[in-house]
């Protein structure tokens, strides 16, 4: 198979949603249909030990939340599928935003009872800005929810994207009968008495009149709604979908696996193949460029706690990876050999000999890489566009509870900060270690991982600081430090100030008008 044919097979996408909409459950079902797992673990089965495959970290298994982005791969219907299961909790949006830089499409999961929720809205805006095609799966049809027409209206009114349903629910909750699949010309029956899951349309494009469904009032209502939508609603356009202007909408129940395989088949038919990426000087690097290139969008420590390893996740942008190849690390200008490279099923992994544009590979990292690094070969020398970061709003001092375990404490700090789990600052005057986060849960996960993975208990003390701003090295003067601010450096040794509030920052600006205070967004 040629390089072009291999690349055209790739479908790389992320699943986004508000917490508890069913994102992890639908991920499990997709993996099951892809033959990657035998049985879908359900988030509700936490006490049974039947944990979700994509939630591999201990704290994720216990709490039923995703706090890291898992990468999973399988083959289905002639396609090589790469799923990135992103964190749903808002405290981990930085990791999610970086992950969205590595995909070609997004699947947006919505709870039929709740509609568009806050985190879904935030994530959609990122997807929209990047022009990523969005496919919508409205979940939990086996429970009572809102009217399907209202949910479609919300997509347009709240998210500002046109929608086109690919199927339509027949009833809902205890009255859920199935899905009217006008895309494939059939009805998918929820709990068929005769064991036949699909009822194919006849030559007139209708359910045969002899079938009991035709006398079902819920089916009659669904038929009327569907005909109205087909006549007056948006028409399906593959070009508009790929351009991110139209979202195909699928209904189903991830928990009961109903409608999921039909969704997968249709999604793979219309989802785009790998696309080009821009370098810092606006050059578009196409997937078929023969030179290998890729960027690191995530670093994860301790995927195998037995070996205390660290993996850098690389999205291949162009060309082909071959085991043992030398690549250029653009940030340092040095050559590195990619000899120990893996692909993933959550925490499970296998060595990979080659991979192509669109694939996600894991490179073992001994401290060489940073999130946002670009790897290239041949004539490609430029970095890709920087990945987004968030400015923390919560800060804590941290120290080792046992001073005799300072070495493991420092190793844990270094690795968790490098993977982007939390931000690190060191006081310019006292040397105190301070952490910054966008939400309280980040601190809790940090403390838990330090104890579990590095055997280092920590003492964490809340700080009064609320704002961080960077300054230029040439503006640095230790005399600017006062009771209203803290002078510090970040992990890249850049100088900064932590302020208690807006008033303290305005006071600083008035006293030092020539010092520029900067927000930092890129790695």
UniProtKB/Swiss-Prot annotation:
The gene is prfC. GTP binds at residues 17-24, 85-89, 139-142. It comes from the Bacteria. InterPro entries: EF-G-like_DII, EFG_III/V, G_TR_CS, P-loop_NTPase, PrfC, RF3_C, RF3_dom_3_sf, RF3_GTP-bd. Belongs to the TRAFAC class translation factor GTPase superfamily. Classic translation factor GTPase family. PrfC subfamily. Signal peptide: none annotated. The keyword rRNA processing does not apply. It is found in: Cytoplasm. This is Peptide chain release factor 3.
